[in-house]
Amino acid sequence: LLGSFSASTAMAEELYSLDTTCRTGNRSFPCGVVATNVDDTTEYRHRFGSQTVSYRVIDEPFVRIEGRASNTKPWSSVKNATINFNTQELCFNNEAFCVKNPSFLADVLINSGDAMQGRTKAGMVFGSNGRVDVACFDNGCDRLLEAIKQ
């Protein structure tokens, strides 16, 4: 068991860390983010006080995002994710948790090529299997949120 643990630990590569602001609802607070490649996923650990909230992006066999409220909790699919490029904020599950992460958003813009250039907002709603069901951009995200609330 220890040998397999060591092997998986060796596969982790820290990409960056930053001190930033996180938010739950209307309450903002300082937090630290560590982004790490772990095997075939990229994990983002958000630390504030004695708490850690983590999200991971999995690309294969399809893009999905999972989160967990602490290191002892299991991973579960997020319901939705939104990006506001103007405020440099990424939010999950109807803004239950948000983080200002300009490093991640710069990567999104670079890796998306022309598709995201000039965009102010992007959003995704995930199905029960974690796969993207609906994607929106700019005013379409506002319209989608209005439709969901009705």
Residue ranges and their predicted role:
Residues 1-4:
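Bacterial N-terminal signal peptides
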Residues 7-9:
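N-terminal signal peptide c-region/cleavage motif recognized by signal peptidases
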Residues 12-150:
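Cysteine-centric segments in proteins
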